[in-house]
Amino acid sequence: MAAQKRTLVLVPGSFNHIEFYIPLIEKFTSETGYPLHTVALRTVGKKPGPLPTIYDDAAFIASEVEKLADDGKEMVLMGHSYGGIPISQCMEGLSLAAREKEGKKGGVVRIAYMTALVPAMGENALAGLEGCPTGYTETDEVG
């Protein structure tokens, strides 16, 4: 029996609906044959009630990843842009190794950051941008 292909779990950037990624999703799945699962961030779009936070995004990502892991999926968790922050935040206990220690199947085998913010544990996005130029950047005729 052939080994099961790993599932790519794509977490979008801030202000990005999953629909923006449809061309990427279609090309990736058709050319590689790998399954791809997307996670819509709680912080994207207008919803009633209090504004969701990064922690709401991380908790939702963790719940989606856990469902896939419980189905035996081995995953590469990929965050684009802002998505790098909540995927970093949500990883505790979701790695394949951590789940195997608990007698569970499935889990995250790799984390991938696609032009994403990669904070250290407990660090916020602004700390990760420390030292970068701020404000408006002038451009000339060549960019």
PLM region spans:
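Active-site signature of alpha/beta-hydrolase-fold catalytic machinery across serine-
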Residues: 23, 89-93
